[in-house]
Amino acid sequence: MELAPKEIFEQLLKWFVVPTFDLVIEIENTGFVLVKRKIEPYKNQWALPGLRMYKGESINESVARIAKQEVGLNIDVSKKILIGQYVGKFKTENQRQDLSTGYYLKISKGATVSINPNHFSKCNITYSIPGNTGAMYKYYLEKAIDLR
């Protein structure tokens, strides 16, 4: 799959909304997988694993890729539950705007999380929402807590 060069992608952010997926992954009886971001937007804040959709991917392919690429988990996407959408407007160089779709996924206890070190500095598996959590992620976590 060919991706736009970073310079071109950054320029497109000035005019286009980016479709993204964010995953509330609950490890059974343990907590939600939270990650501390190293990159913008939400740099140095607690977040959920998430990335943009690539051209040619189905929703299920995107969700599976994100779980594997961002936190090293192979998930059964057929059991995903739509929990909402969120429009993120960011004070970045190009005034980036994302249309995020959030999905809830529950996986078996004992799953091993392996974070993407290029994107995240830490992982926290908890049922609490840390104070330094990005607004979009807090919204999705609150929705997921209501589902439990």
Task: Label each region the model flagged.
Residues 72-111:
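Active-site segment of metal-dependent pyrophosphate-handling enzymes
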Residues 31-70:
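Conserved Nudix-box catalytic region and its N-terminal flanking loop in Nudix hydrolases
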Residues 1-8, 81, 92, 97-99, ...:
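Small, basic N-terminal interaction modules of short regulatory proteins
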Residues 17, 59, 133, 137:
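Hydrophobic (often cysteine-bearing) scaffold residues that line and stabilize catalytic clefts
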Residues 102-104, 112-148:
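NUDIX/MutT-family hydrolases
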Residues 16-20, 43, 48, 96-100:
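Short connector loops at helix/strand junctions that flank enzyme active sites
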